[in-house]
């Protein structure tokens, strides 16, 4: 039976292109999402075999969306589609339970191979990132340690996207006081004291696009 696929990318033209590519290879696309939170909701409702998540999506980045997908639909395998090939991004994704890490610079067939591999419960890395991950495990590179918790990273992304504390509280389902507490704590951890600094940090971490 053909794997059932959920696509998540904030660019409609990208989703349309990916759908055409996958359907041409006999794969079934059962849903599309334009942001990370919609992707999580659809994964919980549709229970796809594979969720393909763009790393830099609005409201919730692909990495944190993958964690939520795993929580709501444990059988769903996740693939991150990204421009980031540095070892610390790959390691962080693997630690989050992502099954596939596909670089956007690779040929289209790379994504199709990734889908088939993760459906066999294997881990798939694009060739362009494989060397970085091998070097990191051999001790030739030191992965960047993410100082923030998953929730703090979500708050960082929303702050960088221009959301108010009240809007952040609503999106996360917490009180305004709790949202403000998360913001204060992440600023203290990062030693950043203004919103502009948080935006720059979020861009460097790939949570939002410049």
Show where each model-derived region lies.
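Active-site residues of response regulator receiver
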Residues: 54, 82
């Amino acid at each position: 039976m053909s794997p059932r696929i959920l696509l998540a990318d904030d660019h409609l033209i990208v989703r349309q292109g990916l759908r055409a590519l996958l359907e041409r290879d006999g794969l079934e696309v059962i849903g599309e999402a334009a942001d990370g939170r919609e992707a999580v909701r659809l994964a919980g409702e549709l229970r796809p075999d594979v969720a393909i998540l763009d790393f830099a999506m609005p409201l919730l980045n692909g990495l944190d969306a993958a964690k939520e997908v795993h929580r709501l639909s444990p059988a769903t395998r996740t693939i991150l589609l990204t421009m980031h090939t540095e070892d610390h991004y790959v390691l962080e994704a693997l630690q989050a339970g992502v099954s596939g890490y596909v670089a956007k610079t690779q040929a289209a067939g790379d994504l199709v191979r990734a889908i088939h591999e993760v459906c066999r419960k294997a881990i798939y890395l694009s060739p362009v990132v494989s060397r970085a991950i091998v070097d990191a495990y051999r001790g030739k590179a030191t992965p960047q340690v993410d100082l923030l918790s998953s929730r703090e990273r979500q708050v960082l992304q929303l702050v960088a996207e221009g959301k108010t504390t009240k809007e952040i509280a609503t999106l996360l389902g917490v009180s305004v006081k709790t949202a403000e507490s998360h913001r204060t704590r992440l600023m203290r951890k990062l030693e950043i004291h203004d919103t502009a600094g948080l935006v720059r940090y979020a861009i460097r971490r790939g949570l939002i696009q410049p």
